């Protein structure tokens, strides 16, 4: 053997220089990695790891990647062995070796990744906490070294194991929770970087929230509400606002949130790295970074909101929801999806977990209010859909209060207050409120016919209207009344439910008056209104007086201040229940709703601020006057309906600027109350004496108020005998000449047999008084209007004596208004103009400011004798000839041929549509001939009459009485495009 090694091998080596088997063993790489692997472990289990040898092993693996699988296999086998022996120090060396491989051999990860995943699985399934910590830390390093989704499924398989470790309770497990949360933060980073959502993502979110709660519970209320972190108080201080908290839960302004800035996980101190609370905040921070899109945001918020429901963490002071969501919102500023958090919270109110729990809903709304205020402080406006959802929930709350028990009523009332707070914060942050008006119009368009639902819908929109009015001083509020909203409000004013009609008038008042409210004392409210102080103050007082009076009704009926109240208090409950329901319940519905809101938010307004009145267009004024006419002659009206009509009329008068000579509605504003007076004093079988008495009081109030606005002082002296007397036990005219309900009266007795007898006697006396001073009233009004309109007095008297007819028939339906003009058959026949004469007077597009309105297709309800002439129906040929005749007159008008701007063109289109179409429709309805040879109309026989009755289908139906309807034919209205073509043709 010595000969072979000493003589033979050297000789072979000198001859076979290329034989690798003959190289020295020190130069052979086959055995070297085993030696390096053996050197990284100390001689004893307690020995320190050799960092230099570990680094040398990794460098060797980087230079010899084909050896990495064998190195990984050795480490995996050694880890199994040491786990069985519970040698934690050796396991730590193995994990350190894998960590160095991840750092140095990143490009060769495919050679050892699966082996590392197997080792991590064994570590996480171990029973020792130290080994769990090593596994979590190594897994975090493995995740951060990923460059793609190759090992996403392998990482996903370990999510549940890490989440279980993160939920270990107790202070002794804080290091384990910190390590597991560090691993979870790495997983969230992986999902953000590689757009991959784990299947067990909900488990990650809940694990993070479990540790977030530990931090906040340990922090204590003192730190949570520390003044130096109170951003809410800073907002309140700058805005000069008082507390808005309504209810016993929490004052929103006294609740502060610690908004923490983002943390850098690589720059943490040792104490911070060992704190699970710090890592929980980092996880929330990375969740906010993960929510790049709205879909991802919802994916994150869904498990969060479900966790808050399950753990009852919605309370603003003791709960976790406000803390987490505020941090999410604050840290989400880079993506621009902050408002989605508020939207998701509001939509979560419909979730089955909280749908039937008013207390949890109240806590959620308080949280949403603070989130909305936080967004507003950063200049971020909430989505408009949030306001719509809040109104919907407010409607549900109001609807539930109709038939709730006392306990449920208190909970719903608290929820309602919090909804108002949240709605106020949302609307305050919206710069342009016009989309809100559009949303209100859409809601009113689909207003149901059921009284309870309709009242709740109107109530929610009424609160929104007052909020918009309250915040309109700082918003870009429109100077003109929204057209679409007005159309739907007018439609709601003829709703089947009488209280819904009152609510529609309240909405009109809240929208047309923008600015702070002026509170009135109870004594002034109960017995007399405040004196006329200024235009603006009285306007808003008029808009809110009705609501306040309704709210005070039950208190006044139940108090013992006067003898009348004592008498009503002594009445039995059964007698009151037999009365009309509206008199004791629904009459105070909207007042309790709105004035609770007004009282709570009175501190938000400054006494120096003045209210603004939204302007109305000419068409809108005509529609409102027509609406007041239609509503005033409804047979089921209550005193509150007449009061609402009177207040809406007063606001319309003030908005119309009657003292302006350019106002084309001056005559109609006086013609309407004069016509209502004539209707109230005309005996007929449709309106009851009680209604006629109320209409007379309403007409007197309207006439006196219009005269005061126009400074016709003599008119007030003439009407003093009607304004100061107590002829109506249910309605009175205050010192401001507006109509008010006598709340101390027995409202349930309105319309009874005894009341009808009293009303007949009162009407008889009124006929005598009116006959004496009627001509005097006409002279005074005509003389005053002469100076405003520059028209002849005789012409004004003639127009004032004509019966008012509604302008916009299609708005209320074909049979919704009464043709009261047939009360004066002979006068109408003598004074009527032929169609050609009327067209010649109003053929100019820009002229004819005082055009005759459209006469309603309904015939007179009077029982007086009328000519028994058969109505003549025009043929198709005659209708076409009439239309061509009018078109020829319009086309032949002298117009400048120069190019017109778009605004002028649209004005001509509107004038054309509201001019010639009215003349033609008025002529057709009244039965004029197509030639000027026969100017007298053919009046129908009075056998039947159609009384408008609202129902669920558009709120209208027809009820036939013993009168015959007149047959009338009307051309269909021209489309806006036709009007534009006609105006464009004229401009050429």
From Swiss-Prot:
Places the protein is found: Nucleus; Cytoplasm
Effect of disrupting the coding gene: Inward rolled leaves due to the presence of defective sclerenchymatous cells on the abaxial side of the leaf. Narrow leaves and reduced plant height.
GO BP terms in the entry: cell differentiation; pollen development
Disordered: annotated span: 844-865
Polar residues bias locations: 853-865
Tissue: Expressed in root tips, and in the vascular bundles of leaf blades, leaf sheaths, and roots, especially in their sclerenchymatous cells.
Keyword flag Nucleus: yes
Keywords in alphabetical order: Cytoplasm, Developmental protein, Differentiation, Nucleus
InterPro entries to which the protein is assigned, alphabetical: ARM-type_fold, EFR3-like_ARM, SRL2-like
GO CC annotation, single: plasma membrane
Primary role: Functions in regulating leaf rolling through abaxial side leaf cell differentiation. May be involved in the transdifferentiation process from mesophyll cells to sclerenchymatous cells.
Protein name as annotated: Protein SEMI-ROLLED LEAF 2
């Amino acid at each position: 053997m010595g000969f072979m090694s000493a003589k033979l091998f050297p000789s072979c080596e000198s001859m076979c220089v290329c034989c690798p088997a003959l190289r020295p063993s020190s130069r052979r790489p086959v055995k070297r990695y085993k030696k390096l692997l053996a050197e990284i472990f100390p001689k004893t289990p307690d020995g320190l790891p050799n960092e230099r040898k570990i680094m040398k092993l990794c460098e060797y693996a980087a230079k010899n990647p084909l050896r990495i699988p064998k190195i990984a296999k050795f480490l995996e086998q050694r880890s199994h062995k040491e786990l069985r022996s519970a040698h934690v120090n050796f396991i730590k060396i193995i994990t350190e070796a894998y960590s160095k491989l991840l750092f140095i051999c990143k490009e060769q990860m495919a050679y050892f990744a699966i082996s590392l995943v197997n080792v991590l699985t064994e570590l996480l399934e171990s029973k020792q906490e130290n080994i769990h910590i090593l596994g979590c830390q190594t897994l975090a390093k493995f995740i951060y070294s990923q460059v793609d989704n190759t090992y996403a499924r392998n990482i996903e398989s370990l999510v549940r194991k890490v989440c279980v470790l993160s939920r270990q309770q107790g202070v002794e497990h804080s290091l384990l929770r910190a390590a597991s949360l560090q691993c979870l933060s790495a997983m969230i980073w992986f999902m953000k970087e590689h757009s991959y959502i784990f299947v067990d993502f909900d488990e990650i979110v809940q694990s993070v929230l479990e540790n977030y709660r530990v931090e906040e519970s340990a922090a204590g209320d003192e730190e949570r509400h520390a003044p130096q972190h109170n951003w809410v108080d800073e907002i309140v201080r700058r805005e000069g606002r008082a507390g808005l908290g309504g209810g016993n839960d929490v004052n929103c302004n006294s609740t502060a949130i610690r908004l923490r800035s983002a943390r850098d996980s690589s720059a943490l101190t040792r104490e911070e790295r060992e704190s699970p609370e710090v890592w929980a905040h980092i996880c929330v921070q990375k969740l906010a970074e993960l929510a790049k899109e709205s879909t991802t945001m919802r994916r994150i918020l869904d498990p969060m909101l479900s966790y808050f429901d399950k753990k009852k963490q919605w309370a603003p002071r003791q709960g976790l929801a406000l803390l987490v969501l505020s941090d999410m919102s604050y840290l989400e500023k880079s993506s621009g999806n902050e408002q989605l958090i508020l939207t998701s919270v509001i939509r979560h109110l419909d979730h089955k977990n909280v749908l039937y729990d008013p207390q949890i809903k109240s806590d959620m709304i308080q949280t949403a209010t603070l989130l909305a205020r936080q967004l507003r402080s950063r200049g971020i406006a909430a989505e408009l859909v949030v306001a719509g959802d809040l109104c919907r929930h407010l409607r549900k709350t109001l609807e539930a209060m109709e038939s709730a028990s006392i306990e449920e009523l208190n909970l719903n009332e608290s929820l309602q207050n919090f909804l108002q707070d949240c709605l106020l914060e949302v609307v305050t942050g919206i710069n342009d409120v016009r989309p809100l008006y559009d949303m209100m119009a859409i809601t009113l368009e689909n207003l149901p016919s059921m009284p309870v639902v309709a009242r709740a819908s109107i109530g929610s929109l009424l609160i929104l209207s007052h909020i918009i009015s309250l915040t309109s001083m700082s918003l870009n509020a429109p100077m003109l009344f929204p057209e679409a909203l007005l159309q739907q409000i007018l439609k709601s004013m003829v709703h089947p439910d009488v209280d819904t009609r009152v609510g529609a008038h309240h909405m009109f008042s809240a929208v047309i008056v923008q600015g702070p409210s002026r509170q009135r004392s109870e004594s002034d409210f109960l017995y007399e209104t405040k004196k006329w102080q200024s235009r603006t103050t009285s306007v808003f007082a008029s808009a809110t007086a009705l609501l306040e009076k309704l709210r005070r009704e039950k208190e006044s009926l139940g108090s013992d201040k006067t003898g009348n109240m004592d008498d009503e208090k002594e009445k039995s409950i059964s007698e009151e229940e037999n009365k009309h329901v509206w008199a004791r319940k629904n009459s105070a519905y909207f007042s309790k709703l709105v004035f609770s809101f007004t009282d709570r938010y009175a501190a938000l307004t400054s006494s120096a601020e003045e209210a603004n009145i939204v302007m109305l267009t000419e068409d809108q004024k005509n529609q409102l006057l027509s609406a007041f006419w239609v509503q005033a002659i409804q047979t089921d009206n209550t005193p509150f309906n007449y009061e609402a009509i009177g207040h809406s009329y007063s606001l319309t008068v003030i908005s119309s600027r009657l003292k302006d000579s350019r106002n084309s509605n001056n005559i109609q504003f006086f013609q309407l109350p004069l016509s209502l007076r004539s209707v109230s004093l005309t005996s007929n079988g449709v309106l009851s004496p009680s209604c006629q008495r109320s209409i007379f009081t309403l007409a007197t109030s309207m006439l006196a108020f219009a005269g005061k606005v126009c400074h016709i002082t003599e008119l007030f002296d003439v009407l003093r005998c009607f304004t100061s007397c107590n002829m109506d036990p249910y309605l009175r005219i205050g010192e401001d000449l507006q109509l008010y309900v006598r709340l101390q009266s027995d409202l349930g007795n309105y319309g009874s047999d005894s009341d009808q007898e009293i009303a007949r006697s009162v009407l008889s006396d009124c006929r005598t008084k009116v006959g004496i001073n009627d001509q005097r009233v006409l002279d005074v009004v005509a003389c005053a209007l002469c100076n405003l309109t520059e028209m002849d007095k005789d012409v004004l008297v003639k127009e004032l004596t004509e019966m008012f007819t509604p302008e916009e028939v299609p708005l209320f339906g074909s049979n919704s208004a009464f043709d009261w003009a047939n009360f004066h058959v002979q006068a109408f026949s003598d004074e009527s103009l032929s169609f050609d004469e009327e067209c010649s007077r109003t053929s100019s597009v820009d002229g004819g400011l005082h055009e005759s309105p459209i006469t309603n297709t309904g015939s007179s309800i009077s029982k007086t004798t009328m000519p028994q002439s058969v109505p003549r129906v025009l043929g198709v040929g005659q209708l076409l000839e009439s239309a061509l005749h009018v078109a020829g007159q319009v086309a032949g008008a002298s117009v400048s041929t120069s190019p017109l701007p778009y605004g002028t063109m649209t004005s001509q289109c509107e004038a054309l549509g509201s001019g010639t179409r009215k003349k033609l429709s008025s002529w057709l309805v009244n039965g004029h001939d197509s030639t000027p040879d026969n100017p007298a109309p053919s009046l129908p026989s009075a056998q039947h009459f159609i009384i408008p009755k609202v129902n669920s289908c558009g709120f209208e139906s027809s009820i036939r009485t013993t009168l015959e309807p007149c047959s009338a034919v009307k051309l269909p209205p021209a489309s806006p495009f036709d009007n534009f073509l006609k105006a464009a043709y004229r401009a050429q």
